[in-house]
């Protein structure tokens, strides 16, 4: 059964993760893929997400797909309990995933039930295509990318950071341009889209002062 935890910011909704996983996550092993952030000047969100996983007690194995061999990638994806892909540039990420067939390895693992977690770019790639975020991410950072197909783990199109600074204007533009044409699912940094088999939900981090 397909299990996806698609976020704009994992660290913002980390408290919802264990409930979704349906098991104690302390001691579980996580393949942590920061590749999308390598071409970005701002990268604090990668550290924020890493710290959030560590706080939950997960054991992190960093997997840099742009430098790892296909064999190393396949082994890490197979041996870890969960797979996480960070935010950054969506087009560069997809370029690097396709170079060594990591995209196909991911699809195989996820279709076999491996729990997948994405932040921003790592969630966008679950969509059928990624072209719809070209106003948000620079395509020129992925000059070797020959097509804009995504992993197509879902039939909808994931849009992160909806109306959040500094993406307020660009996310609204994407909604205006694409929502009449495709099944666009915009979420804020405090929300997550979960996929459990055919069941799709949008959840929100509880506000302060509410019980959770």
Regions found by a protein language model. Give the residues of each.
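A glycine-rich, often tryptophan-bearing local segment used as a flexible ligand/cofactor-contacting loop or short
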Residues: 106, 115, 124-142
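Short, well-ordered alpha-helix to beta-strand connector turns
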Residues: 57, 80, 113, 154-155, ...
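Catalytic-core regions built around general acid/base machinery
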Residues: 76-79, 100-113
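C-terminal and late-domain segments of enzyme folds
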Residues: 1-26, 32-33, 37, 43-44, ...
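Catalytic nucleophile loop
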Residues: 84-87, 110-128
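Short, active-site-adjacent cap segments at secondary-structure transitions
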Residues: 91, 123-126, 192-194
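Portal/gating segments that form or line small-molecule/metal binding sites
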Residues: 37-98
């Amino acid at each position: 059964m397909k299990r996806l935890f698609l976020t704009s910011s994992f660290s913002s909704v980390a408290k919802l993760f264990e409930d979704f996983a349906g098991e104690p996550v302390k001691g579980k092993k996580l393949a942590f893929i920061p590749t999308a952030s390598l071409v970005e000047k701002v990268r604090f969100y990668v550290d924020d997400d890493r710290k959030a996983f560590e706080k939950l007690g997960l054991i992190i194995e960093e997997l840099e797909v742009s430098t790892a061999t296909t064999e190393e990638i396949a082994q890490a994806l197979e041996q870890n309990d969960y797979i996480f892909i960070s935010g950054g540039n969506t087009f560069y990420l997809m370029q690097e995933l396709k170079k060594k067939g990591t995209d196909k390895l991911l699809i195989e693992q996820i279709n076999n039930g491996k729990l997948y977690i994405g932040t921003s770019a790592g969630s966008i790639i679950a969509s059928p295509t990624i072209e719809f975020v070209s106003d948000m991410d620079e395509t020129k950072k992925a000059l070797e990318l020959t097509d804009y197909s995504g992993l197509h783990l879902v039939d909808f199109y994931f849009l992160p950071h909806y109306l959040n600074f500094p993406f307020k204007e660009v996310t609204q533009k994407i909604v205006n341009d694409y929502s009449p044409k495709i099944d666009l699912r915009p979420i804020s940094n405090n929300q997550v889209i979960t996929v459990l088999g055919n069941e799709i939900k949008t959840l929100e981090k509880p506000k302060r002062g509410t019980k959770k």
